[in-house]
């Protein structure tokens, strides 16, 4: 086959034999042994803060062992969450709301109360008599009004 290129060069398909690459071996570098290079672990950390002129804000930070994120409205109410790795290796997660009604939190690190409901308290005879006398006096006062 005779082939002519768009630029006017002509050649035969026999001259297009596949090129055979010779194997290449890389010699070890006499200067650096990659196995002997110590690489320090990288602790990537980031933080952010954005706020407008009326006080609304969003802010937080993240690194290898802890994170925090919060948003705040113009009235100062905040909603956020944070997490960290405890000394025991447990990931502690906390969500919170801070507003006019107080600080409200939910976390996997809070203690859990007992699941057994205690028996009701039974009044002693003296307490039962005092309650009855008190209620009798209350009814007498109500009758006068």
UniProtKB/Swiss-Prot annotation:
InterPro entries xref list: CHIT_BIND_RR_consensus (IPR031311), Cuticle_Struct_Prot (IPR050468), Insect_cuticle (IPR000618)
Keyword set includes Repeat: yes
Protein species of origin: Blaberus craniifer
GO function terms (MF aspect): structural constituent of chitin-based larval cuticle
Pfam family, one: Chitin_bind_4
Protein name, per record: Cuticle protein 7
Domain Chitin-binding type R&R: 41-114
Keyword entries, A-Z: Cuticle, Repeat
Alphabetized PANTHER family for the sequence: CUTICLE PROTEIN (PTHR10380), PUPAL CUTICLE PROTEIN EDG-84A-LIKE PROTEIN (PTHR10380:SF236)
PROSITE patterns to which the protein is assigned, alphabetical: CHIT_BIND_RR_1, CHIT_BIND_RR_2
One GO term describing the cellular component: chitin-based extracellular matrix
